[in-house]
Amino acid sequence: MSEFLDIVNENGLPTGRIVERSVAQMEGIWHRTSHVWLVRRKKETVQVLLQKRTAFKSFPGCYDISSAGHIPAGEGFLPSALRELKEELGVSAKAEELICCGDRTIIWDDVFFGKEYHDRQYTRVFVLWKDMEEKDFFLQPEEVDGVRWIDLELCIHNVKENLFPHCIELPELLMVRDVASKSPLAVKQA
């Protein structure tokens, strides 16, 4: 079944036209995505949840954003983010629990499974504080091979130094750190 996306302008606003997802990624047409990073306090540190992508996705076997997805035509950033959390990780959340880190653009040109890929995303990035154990997530097997909590600062270091297989962009991870560090939940309560 085809998935249709809103074509957006440079400000992430729908133009009133739609495009098939595969065409958007083949031709480099701008569309929207939502990214949600789950974070939690563990002892003295803030941890971030990474998902491991399946072998059948682009960037197979790489660690990635906790939950992310393309926004279907007619849907907004928040509903899409909440839907993807539920589908990929089995996590239910309310819109008011998501903390917006900001918007960013992603331009990515590559070849996956022998096909050219020209991705142009206008992305809204969110943080969700969620203290769950890895075993308590209900993973979507077509999308996610597993999940792993990692100290946020260690994750930033490992991404900078490319010390593990990942498709995480450092500027986005720094956005997450900035927002998470300002939250009262980031500070250990006395």
Which residue stretches match the model-derived regions?
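Conserved Nudix-box catalytic region and its N-terminal flanking loop in Nudix hydrolases
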Residues: V23-S34, E44-R83, E87
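A short coil-to-beta-strand element that immediately follows conserved catalytic motifs
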Residues: S92-D103
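Nudix hydrolase/Nudix homology domain
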Residues: S22, G61-Y63, S67, A73, ...
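Acidic, metal-coordinating catalytic segment for phosphate/diphosphate chemistry
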Residues: M1-E44
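Conserved hydrophobic "DFG−1" position in protein kinase catalytic cores
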Residues: I7, L38, L50, V127-L128, ...
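Short, well-ordered strand-loop elements centered on a beta-strand within folded domains, enriched
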Residues: P14-I18, E44-K52, K135-L139
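Short loop segments at secondary-structure junctions
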Residues: N11, R40-K43, T54, W129-E133, ...
